[in-house]
Amino acid sequence: RRQRQMCIRDSDMGPLIDANALKSVEEKVKKAIEQGAELLCGGHRIGTKGYFFEPTILINCTQKMDIIQEETFGPVLPVVEFTEVEDAIAWANDCEYGLTSSIYTQNLDMTFKLIRALKFGETYVNRENFEAMQGFHAGWRKSGIGGADGKHGLEEYLQTQLVYLETKG
C-alpha cells in the first residue's frame, strides 16, 4: 500500500488531518482493545513522519464500546456479527450519532427495508462512503446540524421571496 499525501496521484491512502487526529484514533483503538475488542489487523501509526495510521479492523466489538458509540474519523472498522437483520437495525440505531450507514446486499427488497429502518442522514448501498457533490451531506442526531453540500446546502443561505406581478398589456 502506498501511504502518502493525497495530492500524489498513485496514493492509496492519505494521512489524518493533524497530530491531534492521529492521537485520537490511536487512543480509540487502544481503548477498544482494553474494552475487549480483538485487533485483527493494523492498529498502529505508520512511520514517524506525517499523520499516517494503518487501516485497522477490530472484531468482537460491543455496543457499549466507545469505538462504536463515537465517530472515529480514521481508517478503523469495528466489526459486529449478526444473524437477524432486525437485531442489526436496532443495534445500528442505538447510537447518539447518525451520519452514515452502509448496506451491502443484492436483495432489493432488503435494501429498501433497511433504508426505511436505519436512522441515518446518508445511506450508501453497495459502495464506499463518498458522497456526490450534488448530494446533501445530512447528519442526523448529534452528527451535524443539517446538510451543507450541493443545491440543498446553498438554499440554507437563501431567503425566498415571492413576487406576484400583474401588468396591463
Q: Which residue stretches match the model-derived regions?
A:
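Short secondary-structure junctions
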Residues: 36-45
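Short, small-residue-biased leader/transition segments that mark boundaries at the very start
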Residues: 1-8
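Short beta-strand to alpha-helix junction loop
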Residues: 16-26
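Conserved C-terminal structural/oligomerization subdomain of aldehyde/semialdehyde dehydrogenase
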Residues: 45, 52-169
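Short, conserved active-site loop motifs that form the nucleotide-linked donor/cofactor pocket
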Residues: 4, 37, 76-77
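Short linear capping/connector segments at secondary-structure termini
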Residues: 9-14
